[in-house]
UniProtKB/Swiss-Prot annotation:
GO terms for molecular function: 3-demethoxyubiquinol 3-hydroxylase activity; metal ion binding. CDD domains: DMQH (cd01042). The gene is coq7. It is an enzyme of class 1 (oxidoreductase). Fe cation 2 binds at E94, E146, E178, H181. Residues 25-44 are annotated as: Disordered. It is found in: Cell membrane. It comes from the Bacteria. It catalyses: a 5-methoxy-2-methyl-3-(all-trans-polyprenyl)benzene-1,4-diol + AH2 + O2 = a 3-demethylubiquinol + A + H2O. Catalyzes the hydroxylation of 2-nonaprenyl-3-methyl-6-methoxy-1,4-benzoquinol during ubiquinone biosynthesis. This is 3-demethoxyubiquinol 3-hydroxylase. Belongs to the COQ7 family. Its EC number is 1.14.99.60.
């Protein structure tokens, strides 16, 4: 029976640096699953709608950048190997979302947010601190974060033009995946955050969405 490879602290730091580069450098990440948008027809949208959808997808892309950083930070400081492995697996699944959003943004003739490095650093730090506190808090933070993401995705789905089937297919699959991540984190023993904490997280999320919609 094969044994799981043990990484030294230096190995883990190098892996984190590699993950950060693949997350932040344009077109450097690769998805495991094809984009749900591939099978959808490409309908013409007005310039106003195109810019609006690009802004929404830019928000979602930055959200995935934050998710990558959060999971990687938690994986670095998680105490139990099974929790660390779960964080690393979740980060791999989020790569698909990252790539899909980036591809759609480029199809719409726009760009990803210049603020991504800032939000990556902040999210990585939050994830690392949560992991240091306890694995239960770390998992609970995942569940609470995914709840926020699901809320944003639902709002964005309502705002999409009816003819934009490509963006809709991407966001619907992302919503399904994120709901599963939240449920899995709680089932693994995650702490259910109280309403005031979730409210504070929501305020921070609004800062991200407002700032990345245009830049």
């Amino acid at each position: 029976m094969a044994t799981e490879r043990q990484y030294s602290p230096i190995d883990r730091l190098l892996l984190q640096a590699d993950s950060a580069m693949r997350t932040l450098l344009p077109s450097s990440a690769h998805s495991r699953r094809p984009s749900p948008a591939i099978v959808q027809p490409d309908h013409k949208m007005s310039d106003v709608d195109t810019r609006h959808v690009a802004g929404l997808m830019r928000i979602n892309h930055t959200g995935e950048v934050c998710a990558q950083a959060l999971y990687q930070g938690q994986a670095l400081t998680a105490k139990l190997p099974k929790v660390r492995k779960a964080m690393e697996h979740a980060a791999e699944e989020e790569i698909d979302h990252l790539v899909w959003c980036e591809q759609r943004i480029h199809q719409l003739g726009s760009h990803t947010s210049v603020l991504n490095p800032l939000f990556y650093g902040l999210s990585f730090g939050i994830g690392a601190v949560a992991g240091v506190i306890s694995d239960r808090v770390s998992l609970g933070f995942v569940a609470a974060t995914e709840d926020q993401v699901c809320k944003h995705l639902g709002e964005h789905l309502e705002q999409l033009p009816i003819e934009d089937g490509k963006s809709r297919a991407i966001l619907e699959q992302m919503l399904s995946d994120e709901e599963h991540h939240a449920e899995s984190a709680l089932e693994a023993g995650g702490f259910r955050f109280p309403a005031p904490v979730k409210f504070g997280m929501g305020v921070l999320a609004k800062v991200m969405t407002k700032s990345t919609y245009r830049i």
